[in-house]
Amino acid sequence: MTKKIAVFPGSFDPFTNGHLDTVLRASRLFDEVVVAAMTNTSKRALFSSAEKLALIEASTADIANVKAVAAPRRLTVEFARSIGARFIIR
């Protein structure tokens, strides 16, 4: 059976309780959820990429099938394909 991998992209500046709720719900539907902290150059960031990643990791540490990554600057669909994700969470 194919592993169901989903990516949850966003600027997450900051990562909120609403984002966490979405991740929790997704973690019940998919084998793996990748929270992809992306850079939005049209927005002025409150937190650095490293700070955002640390906040996401701390918030999701107790959810076994969730991992956080700093996504490279490219189209979301290209990133999803590169990690084998067939689903994008919005």
Named regions from a protein language model:
Residues 1-90:
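Nucleotidyltransferase catalytic core that binds NTPs
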